[in-house]
Amino acid sequence: DIRKKYIKFLGYEFKMVRGKSRRGYISRTIPDRDRLKRKVDQIAEEIKNIPKCYSREQLIGEINRINSKVRGIIQYNQCCTWVSVAMDKHGRRLQLLAMRRLKQYKGKWIPANQTQNLPHIHQQYKQKIPSVKYRDIYVGFTALTFCRWEQTRYKNQAETPYTEDGRQAYFQRTKKKRINARLDEMYPDKTARA
């Protein structure tokens, strides 16, 4: 009974809880807590294993690699309604680990909107993140708490590759060029005709 106990499916936990809907229940989704903890532990180990003798360029590369893993976890789980609640439990731990590792490199707590990496994400937040100075810019570890719930779209049954209307609907939703248009641009005219 999903009104009493969570069910696990594809890395998410799903439950129906009492709410203000017409039928009395609303759905609550949360990232699978065990799986999320394993992923965060893996990232924490990678932060701990950053060598103390790295050059600045190597350190920046390592920060970017770890940031991409954090963003991947966030993007996979942002369709959950309780994503921010789940991420808050682990976010502070990663930030403190990162700051402890950056002390050897004279790291500081800098507001996220003043760092230069991941600008489309960090510009929305004023929370301080552990950062290191490289030349005259700051590069920081992104926070696991920089996530928001995004409602997923329902499947549009008319969107099919077999009809012109379906292809047009897909193009409008994704704003992508069609495959044959891409191939025409990739090859020169002589090759395309042959």
Model region roles, listed by residue range:
Residues D1-A194:
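Non-catalytic terminal/accessory segments
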